[in-house]
Swiss-Prot record:
Primary role: Catalyzes the formation of S-adenosylmethionine (AdoMet) from methionine and ATP. The overall synthetic reaction is composed of two sequential steps, AdoMet formation and the subsequent tripolyphosphate hydrolysis which occurs prior to release of AdoMet from the enzyme.
GO molecular function list: ATP binding; magnesium ion binding; methionine adenosyltransferase activity
Cofactor(s) recorded in Swiss-Prot or TrEMBL: Mg(2+); K(+)
Positions of region (Flexible loop): 98-108
Residues annotated as binding ATP: H14, D174, G175, K176, R240, F241, D249, R255, K256, A272, K276
Keyword match Protein biosynthesis: no
Binding site for K(+): E42
Highest taxon of the lineage: Bacteria
Record's subunit section: Homotetramer; dimer of dimers.
Organism: Caldicellulosiruptor saccharolyticus (strain ATCC 43494 / DSM 8903 / Tp8T 6331)
Protein name: S-adenosylmethionine synthase
């Protein structure tokens, strides 16, 4: 049976992604000086204005307006005619401390208060919020990500590369990509449709943009065997994309959660990542769920695997662990879930310890996806639990 699936990505200059990157740049700057800081940093951007807000509890000082301007400059917004200017935009900050009502549950988990866990056992911290988190992996690509989002991210990164490298100097920072993949019997066989929308200078013609993007962006990224004469390609389908960035649309942190994860191919718990320190399970437990799912697929126990975790605020142990292999598992999903419980410690402090999350590693994942990153050595992307998973599978 044939079916189509579509995923999108955005470039680092997309207004929402500007916000994600500033949020994580602030987080990184704080973690570099104070690894145990509590950070929840949100950003909004609009024409000529950046608003940085949130709750931060830390012993250190960081220059938030400078961090915001530096991030905007790195993205490429250096002139007002691009839609934003790092040097002339206004930066407003509104920062409070973390609520003491939240802090009391994170500082000491319910289990520790009840004497079920010692204070010094992996810090004995509770989850920073309730909620459910999903992780996913599949064998469609070398990085065990779904093909549509994998290709959409690569196209978006290529847009930034040809812009910053001067290959297509008329491009500007804002842009989006979208890829529709055709599947036969659940395996990707071809790319059905590609959409690329990229901001550009007013002088360049649509025909030139179309030809250049096909030659310098699409052809180097999409595998030749995945393109055919029936593949539909749309480049700037409105015909013009000069006004972009925060001048074209306002932006907010956490508004691209599907781009950040699996492109809609797997379920999502609803929590965003950027600007949150690792005591927030929205971030750390979603990373852990990906780590679990990827190791299960890498071990060959399934072709596809989705892991759901759930937490209560102030409680360390996950309330539930669910595994779904969509009928591709070599053993029952319930048995795989038992293996997960034996192999992975999914309490927040253990996740932070095992994935070494109290480091300034977040800004670089704030654009082009948090998962399946071939360009980064991310701890949640490692497949170092394969051997122990296979050993446990033999004993079950």
């Amino acid at each position: 049976m044939r079916k189509l699936f579509t995923s999108e990505s955005v470039t680092e200059g997309h207004p929402d992604k500007i916000c994600d990157q500033i949020s994580d740049a602030v987080l990184d700057a704080i973690l570099e000086k104070d690894p145990y800081a509590r950070v929840a940093c949100e950003v909004a951007v609009t024409t000529g204005l950046v608003l940085v807000m949130g709750e931060i509890t830390t012993k250190c000082y960081v220059d938030i307006p400078k961090i915001a301007r530096d991030t905007i400059r790195e993205i490429g917004y250096t002139r007002a005619k691009y839609g934003f200017d790092a040097d002339t935009c206004a930066v407003i900050t509104s920062i409070d401390e973390q609520s003491p009502d939240i802090a009391m549950g994170v500082d000491k988990a319910l289990e520790a208060k009840l004497g079920e866990m010692t204070d010094d056992e992996i810090e004995a911290i509770g989850a920073g919020d309730q909620g459910m988190m999903f992780g996913f992996a599949c064998d469609e690509t070398p990085v065990l990500m779904p093909m549509p989002i994998y290709l959409a991210h690569k196209l978006a990164r290529r847009l930034a590369y040809v812009r910053k490298g001067g290959i297509l100097p008329y491009l500007r920072p804002d842009g989006k990509t979208q890829v529709t993949v055709e599947y036969e019997d659940d395996r990707p066989i071809r790319v059905d449709t590609i959409v690329v929308s990229t901001q550009h200078s007013p002088e360049v013609t649509h025909a030139q943009i179309e030809a250049d993007v096909i030659e310098h962006v699409i052809k180097p990224i999409i595998p030749e065997g995945m393109l055919d004469k029936n593949t539909k390609i749309y480049i700037n389908p409105t015909g013009r994309f000069v006004i972009g960035g925060p001048q074209g649309d306002s932006g907010l942190t956490g508004r691209k959660i599907i781009v950040d994860t699996y492109g809609g191919y797997a379920r999502h718990g609803g929590g965003a990542f950027s600007g949150k320190d690792p005591t927030k399970v929205d971030r750390s437990a979603t990373y852990a769920a990906r780590y679990v799912a990827k190791n299960i697929v890498a071990a060959g126990l399934a072709k596809k695997c989705e892991v759901q975790l759930s937490y209560a605020i102030g409680v360390a142990r996950p309330l539930s662990i669910r595994v779904d292999t969509f009928g591709t598992g070599k053993i029952d999903d319930e048995k795989i879930a038992e293996i997960v419980k034996r192999v992975f410690d999914l309490r927040p402090a253990a996740i932070i310890r095992d994935l070494d999350l109290r480091r300034p590693i977040y800004k670089k994942v704030a654009a082009y996806g948090h998962f399946g990153r071939e360009d980064l050595d991310l701890p949640w992307e490692r497949t170092d639990k394969v051997d122990i998973i296979l050993k446990e599978a033999q004993n079950i």
